[in-house]
Amino acid sequence: MANWTQLGLQDASSPLMEELIYFHDYTLIILTLITILVFYGLASLLFSSNTNRFFLEGQGLETVWTIIPAVILIFIALPSLQLLYLMDEVNNPYLTIKAIGHQWYWSYEYADYRELEFDSYMIPTSDLTSGNPRLLEVDNRLTLPAQTPIRVLVSSADVLHSWAIPSLGIKMDAVPGRLNQVNFFISRCGLFYGQCSEICGANHSFMPIVIESVNFSTFETWVSNFITE
């Protein structure tokens, strides 16, 4: 979850988010160097008296400023393509969840277990207990095992929604009449917060997502208790 005065991205809680942060930092370094070079060129042009006013063409210079940007784009595109393929990779998920967006709450179905489904509503500010984040806590958290390949099928029962967990590097649109798939691997136990990231009506800001990641034995106990209840 993001904290006050936090300027960077949230701490990565999945291998995919780690790769996204590496790519962000790598691209930022390249953009910083380009910005410094451009400002240096502008400063040299403005404050130098050695400008040749009759300089009409320069084949060598034109070749350089064509090749160098092309090389820079290649160095940005290759890691980006690798990430795109990594996002779509399916590694035999152990658990499949179906997340359905509604106005304005989420419902979850555990496809591998019978009668394991529930709705998840935001807890109003007046009902929050001490320590719970405002507009982010829900009455029923999505409980998932850590260190386990997971697949989530995302859809919608009414309008467009988007199921997004920033610390896991996940954002998948929920489209009525269509199933979209997202795969992830949670690296550690903890609470991970997200929100609907597609404007879906008056209460768009009030349909948060909370994943509670636990170890596998705790998850099996939770499943057994939920079904018996």
UniProtKB/Swiss-Prot annotation:
Record localization: Mitochondrion inner membrane
Binding site residues for Mg(2+): E198
Keyword Transmembrane helix: yes
GO cellular component, as recorded: mitochondrial inner membrane
Catalysed reactions, semicolon-separated: 4 Fe(II)-[cytochrome c] + O2 + 8 H(+)(in) = 4 Fe(III)-[cytochrome c] + 2 H2O + 4 H(+)(out)
Keyword rRNA-binding: no
Membrane-side (Mitochondrial matrix) residue stretches: 49-62
Major localization listed first in the record, in broad terms: mitochondrion
GO annotation terms (biological process): ATP synthesis coupled electron transport
Binding of Cu cation A1, residues: H161, C196, C200, M207
SUPFAM superfamilies the UniProt entry points to: Cupredoxins, Cytochrome c oxidase subunit II-like, transmembrane region
EC number(s) stated in the UniProt entry for this protein: 7.1.1.9
Disulfide bonds: none
Transmembrane segments: 27-48, 63-82
PROSITE patterns, A to Z: COX2, COX2_CUA, COX2_TM
Cofactor descriptive note: Binds a dinuclear copper A center per subunit.
Cofactor: Cu cation
Positions that bind Cu cation A2: C196, E198, C200, H204
Mitochondrial intermembrane topology ranges: 1-26, 83-229
Membrane topology: Multi-pass membrane protein
Taxonomic superkingdom: Eukaryota
Subunit architecture: Component of the cytochrome c oxidase (complex IV, CIV), a multisubunit enzyme composed of a catalytic core of 3 subunits and several supernumerary subunits. The complex exists as a monomer or a dimer and forms supercomplexes (SCs) in the inner mitochondrial membrane with ubiquinol-cytochrome c oxidoreductase (cytochrome b-c1 complex, complex III, CIII).
Protein name per Swiss-Prot or TrEMBL: Cytochrome c oxidase subunit 2
